[in-house]
UniProtKB/Swiss-Prot annotation:
Pfam families from the UniProt entry: Fer4_7
Family classification: Belongs to the complex I 23 kDa subunit family.
Lineage, opening ranks: Bacteria, Bacillati, Actinomycetota, Actinomycetes, Mycobacteriales
Protein function: NDH-1 shuttles electrons from NADH, via FMN and iron-sulfur (Fe-S) centers, to quinones in the respiratory chain. The immediate electron acceptor for the enzyme in this species is believed to be menaquinone. Couples the redox reaction to proton translocation (for every two electrons transferred, four hydrogen ions are translocated across the cytoplasmic membrane), and thus conserves the redox energy in a proton gradient.
GO cellular component terms, semicolon-separated: plasma membrane
Enzyme class: translocase
Protein name per its UniProtKB record: NADH-quinone oxidoreductase subunit I
Amino acid sequence: MPKFLDAVAGFGVTFGSMFKKPVTEEYPEKPGPVAKRYHGRHQLNRYADGLEKCIGCELCAWACPADAIFVEGADNTEAERYSPGERYGRVYQINYLRCIGCGLCIEACPTRALTMTNDYEMADDNRADLIYGKDKLLAPLEPGMGAPPHAMAPGATDEDYYRGTVSPSAEADAR
Protein backbone atom coordinates (compact mmCIF):
# COMPACT_ATOMS: atom_id res chain seq x y z
CA MET A 1 0.00 0.00 0.00
CA PRO A 2 1.47 3.38 -0.95
CA LYS A 3 2.50 5.80 1.82
CA PHE A 4 0.07 8.59 0.78
CA LEU A 5 -2.89 6.27 1.55
CA ASP A 6 -1.83 6.15 5.22
CA ALA A 7 -2.73 9.83 5.59
CA VAL A 8 -6.08 9.30 3.87
CA ALA A 9 -6.86 6.36 6.18
CA GLY A 10 -6.13 8.58 9.20
CA PHE A 11 -8.58 11.20 7.99
CA GLY A 12 -11.26 8.49 7.69
CA VAL A 13 -12.06 8.86 11.39
CA THR A 14 -12.28 12.63 11.06
CA PHE A 15 -14.55 12.49 8.01
CA GLY A 16 -16.76 9.86 9.67
CA SER A 17 -17.42 12.05 12.71
CA MET A 18 -18.05 15.20 10.65
CA PHE A 19 -21.48 13.99 9.59
CA LYS A 20 -22.73 12.82 13.01
CA LYS A 21 -25.21 14.93 14.98
CA PRO A 22 -23.29 17.01 17.57
CA VAL A 23 -23.98 16.34 21.24
CA THR A 24 -24.24 19.70 22.98
CA GLU A 25 -25.07 20.09 26.67
CA GLU A 26 -26.60 23.40 27.71
CA TYR A 27 -25.42 22.85 31.28
CA PRO A 28 -26.18 25.94 33.32
CA GLU A 29 -29.55 26.53 31.66
CA LYS A 30 -30.66 22.88 31.44
CA PRO A 31 -28.80 20.62 33.86
CA GLY A 32 -28.76 17.00 32.77
CA PRO A 33 -30.17 14.14 34.82
CA VAL A 34 -28.12 12.88 37.76
CA ALA A 35 -27.92 9.20 38.61
CA LYS A 36 -29.77 8.26 41.82
CA ARG A 37 -26.64 6.81 43.37
CA TYR A 38 -24.37 9.73 42.42
CA HIS A 39 -22.01 10.76 45.23
CA GLY A 40 -22.03 14.53 45.61
CA ARG A 41 -22.11 16.81 48.63
CA HIS A 42 -22.24 15.26 52.12
CA GLN A 43 -25.23 15.58 54.44
CA LEU A 44 -25.55 15.04 58.19
CA ASN A 45 -28.88 13.30 58.79
CA ARG A 46 -31.42 13.58 61.59
CA TYR A 47 -33.77 11.18 63.36
CA ALA A 48 -37.54 11.48 62.85
CA ASP A 49 -37.91 13.73 65.91
CA GLY A 50 -35.15 16.13 64.79
CA LEU A 51 -32.22 14.92 66.92
CA GLU A 52 -28.92 14.62 65.06
CA LYS A 53 -27.60 11.17 64.17
CA CYS A 54 -23.95 12.23 64.54
CA ILE A 55 -22.49 11.11 67.87
CA GLY A 56 -19.12 12.83 67.44
CA CYS A 57 -17.13 9.59 67.36
CA GLU A 58 -14.71 10.93 64.69
CA LEU A 59 -14.58 7.62 62.79
CA CYS A 60 -15.36 9.46 59.55
CA ALA A 61 -12.38 11.76 60.09
CA TRP A 62 -10.08 8.82 60.78
CA ALA A 63 -11.30 6.99 57.67
CA CYS A 64 -10.77 9.98 55.36
CA PRO A 65 -7.58 9.44 53.31
CA ALA A 66 -7.46 13.14 52.33
CA ASP A 67 -7.81 14.39 55.93
CA ALA A 68 -10.74 16.56 54.79
CA ILE A 69 -13.01 16.05 57.83
CA PHE A 70 -12.70 17.66 61.26
CA VAL A 71 -15.00 16.57 64.09
CA GLU A 72 -15.02 17.77 67.67
CA GLY A 73 -17.36 15.86 69.95
CA ALA A 74 -19.03 17.11 73.11
CA ASP A 75 -21.16 15.55 75.83
CA ASN A 76 -24.94 15.77 75.80
CA THR A 77 -26.69 16.89 78.97
CA GLU A 78 -30.33 16.52 79.93
CA ALA A 79 -30.72 20.30 79.55
CA GLU A 80 -29.06 20.35 76.11
CA ARG A 81 -29.49 17.16 74.07
CA TYR A 82 -28.52 17.22 70.39
CA SER A 83 -28.34 13.46 69.77
CA PRO A 84 -29.78 10.43 71.56
CA GLY A 85 -26.42 9.11 72.79
CA GLU A 86 -23.94 10.39 75.34
CA ARG A 87 -22.13 12.58 72.79
CA TYR A 88 -22.79 14.69 69.72
CA GLY A 89 -20.68 16.38 67.07
CA ARG A 90 -20.31 19.95 68.38
CA VAL A 91 -18.04 20.99 65.49
CA TYR A 92 -18.26 19.25 62.12
CA GLN A 93 -16.38 20.49 59.06
CA ILE A 94 -15.64 19.07 55.61
CA ASN A 95 -13.01 20.77 53.49
CA TYR A 96 -14.15 20.30 49.88
CA LEU A 97 -10.80 21.57 48.65
CA ARG A 98 -9.34 18.32 49.96
CA CYS A 99 -12.27 15.87 49.66
CA ILE A 100 -11.80 13.28 46.91
CA GLY A 101 -15.37 11.94 47.06
CA CYS A 102 -14.33 8.37 47.85
CA GLY A 103 -17.13 7.71 50.35
CA LEU A 104 -14.95 5.99 52.98
CA CYS A 105 -16.38 8.37 55.59
CA ILE A 106 -19.88 7.09 54.76
CA GLU A 107 -18.78 3.48 55.23
CA ALA A 108 -17.13 4.27 58.58
CA CYS A 109 -20.14 5.99 60.19
CA PRO A 110 -21.72 3.66 62.79
CA THR A 111 -25.03 5.57 63.02
CA ARG A 112 -25.54 6.28 59.30
CA ALA A 113 -25.38 9.98 60.13
CA LEU A 114 -23.33 10.89 57.07
CA THR A 115 -24.58 10.31 53.53
CA MET A 116 -23.86 11.82 50.14
CA THR A 117 -26.48 13.77 48.20
CA ASN A 118 -26.91 14.36 44.46
CA ASP A 119 -25.81 17.99 44.80
CA TYR A 120 -22.73 18.56 42.68
CA GLU A 121 -22.75 22.33 42.17
CA MET A 122 -20.31 23.40 44.86
CA ALA A 123 -17.93 25.62 42.88
CA ASP A 124 -17.00 28.92 44.49
CA ASP A 125 -14.51 31.70 43.91
CA ASN A 126 -13.65 31.97 47.61
CA ARG A 127 -11.61 29.10 49.06
CA ALA A 128 -12.91 29.69 52.59
CA ASP A 129 -16.50 29.08 51.43
CA LEU A 130 -15.57 25.52 50.39
CA ILE A 131 -15.05 24.50 54.01
CA TYR A 132 -18.57 23.43 54.93
CA GLY A 133 -19.53 23.63 58.58
CA LYS A 134 -22.27 21.85 60.44
CA ASP A 135 -24.76 24.58 59.50
CA LYS A 136 -24.38 23.76 55.78
CA LEU A 137 -24.15 19.99 56.23
CA LEU A 138 -27.13 19.30 58.52
CA ALA A 139 -30.29 18.07 56.81
CA PRO A 140 -33.10 20.63 57.03
CA LEU A 141 -35.86 20.11 59.58
CA GLU A 142 -38.88 18.43 58.02
CA PRO A 143 -42.47 18.80 59.23
CA GLY A 144 -42.86 16.96 62.53
CA MET A 145 -39.24 17.48 63.59
CA GLY A 146 -38.30 19.59 66.58
CA ALA A 147 -35.17 21.74 66.48
CA PRO A 148 -32.49 20.46 68.86
CA PRO A 149 -31.65 20.73 71.67
CA HIS A 150 -34.62 18.84 73.07
CA ALA A 151 -35.22 15.72 75.13
CA MET A 152 -35.40 12.25 73.65
CA ALA A 153 -38.84 10.93 72.74
CA PRO A 154 -40.70 9.79 75.89
CA GLY A 155 -39.94 6.16 76.69
CA ALA A 156 -37.40 5.84 73.84
CA THR A 157 -33.92 4.40 74.33
CA ASP A 158 -30.72 4.81 72.32
CA GLU A 159 -31.50 1.45 70.70
CA ASP A 160 -34.93 2.69 69.53
CA TYR A 161 -33.24 5.59 67.78
CA TYR A 162 -30.66 3.31 66.18
CA ARG A 163 -33.34 0.91 64.91
CA GLY A 164 -35.36 3.82 63.51
CA THR A 165 -38.50 3.15 65.54
CA VAL A 166 -38.81 6.70 66.91
CA SER A 167 -41.72 8.73 65.57
CA PRO A 168 -41.75 12.48 64.88
CA SER A 169 -41.57 14.80 67.85
CA ALA A 170 -44.72 15.61 69.82
CA GLU A 171 -43.19 19.02 70.59
CA ALA A 172 -43.04 19.85 66.88
CA ASP A 173 -46.67 18.76 66.37
CA ALA A 174 -47.77 21.16 69.12
CA ARG A 175 -46.18 24.12 67.27
